Every structure is written in C-alpha cells, then in structure tokens.
Amino acid sequence: MKLILTAAVENLGVAGDIVEVKNGYGRNLLLPRGLAIVATPGAEKQIEGIKRAQEAREIRDLDHAREVKVALEALEGVTIAVRTSESGKLFGSVKTDDIVDAVKAAGGPNLDKRAIVLPKNLVKTTGKYQVEAKLTDGIVSRVKFEVVAA
C-alpha cells in the first residue's frame, strides 16, 4: 500500500514522505490515527507544493533552533522540587513535562515535551542530571537540571 505520511513515524519516515507499507499496517494503524493518507496522483502533487514551502520554513527553523540551543546550554539554576522519601528516592519519577516546566520557570525557552529524551534509567532519586533535547534534525542541546526534595 502506497501512503503519504502526514506526521513523523519512527522507523518509517517524516511528514511528506511517500512510503510503501503492508496493507494491514496502513489500514489498521497509520490511516486511522491520521499519520498517513492514501497516495493518489493529486495528493502527490499537493505534497510537492507543501515540501517546497516546508524547505523554506526549515531554514528559518534552523536559525531558531540554534538560538534555543545557545539559550538552553547557558541556562543555570533549573531545579525540580518533588516529594521524596527520607532516603532521597522520589515518589514516582521526573517526567518530560516536569523538565519542560522547570526550564520555563528558570527563564528558558519553550520546549516541546516530545523533544526531551529521558535516559532508560529514569530519574528516580535526588541529584543533578543532564538530558538531551532534540530541537531539529542534527541540532541537539543538553539540558542540565537538579532534582531536590520538596
């Protein structure tokens, strides 16, 4: 089944890509969730126009992403206050929403929570941590924060 992606799909492509997938994957996952549309000649022409406009937008986005990267790496004093046990273990864990809110509260730029990449071993104790923020393709910034007991 030939589809045009309307959003980025992991291990498949980004918005605007024309992909060939198995019928069941397309009908049962991609189409119902709005991640793709059926590739027709008219839709392919429309996507070409959208891609040209998107390329012009990406140039502006790269400049903005570089500015955000500089702002994030210069940011100091990002703290997240959470409830902990006496031994310093968190009740739960720090999530991407918490990091985005803490960066915003510290005077940093607005981030999309999907841009934050948490480590496999989640943040479950107090201390200093560092995570990556994927701003665009090829531009990754490090966000440093400290988890403290509330």
From Swiss-Prot:
User: What GO MF terms are annotated?
Assistant: rRNA binding; structural constituent of ribosome
Family matches, as InterPro entries: Ribosomal_bL9, Ribosomal_bL9/RNase_H1_N, Ribosomal_bL9_bac/chp, Ribosomal_bL9_C, Ribosomal_bL9_C_sf, Ribosomal_bL9_N, Ribosomal_bL9_N_sf
Q: What is any one of the record's Gene Ontology cellular component terms?
A: ribosome
PROSITE patterns this protein is in? RIBOSOMAL_L9
Q: Where are the transmembrane segments?
A: none
Q: Does the keyword Plastid apply?
A: no
- Residues annotated as coiled-coil are none
Please give the Pfam families that the UniProt record associates with this protein: Ribosomal_L9_C, Ribosomal_L9_N
GO biological process per UniProt: translation
- Can the keyword Signal be found in this entry's annotation? no
Which keywords belong to this entry?
Ribonucleoprotein, Ribosomal protein, RNA-binding, rRNA-binding
Q: Where is the signal peptide?
A: none
Described purpose of this protein according to its UniProt entry = Binds to the 23S rRNA.
Q: Into which family does the record put it?
A: Belongs to the bacterial ribosomal protein bL9 family.
Which PANTHER family does the entry mention? 50S RIBOSOMAL PROTEIN L9 (PTHR21368)
Q: What is this protein called?
A: Large ribosomal subunit protein bL9
Species: Corynebacterium glutamicum (strain ATCC 13032 / DSM 20300 / JCM 1318 / BCRC 11384 / CCUG 27702 / LMG 3730 / NBRC 12168 / NCIMB 10025 / NRRL B-2784 / 534)
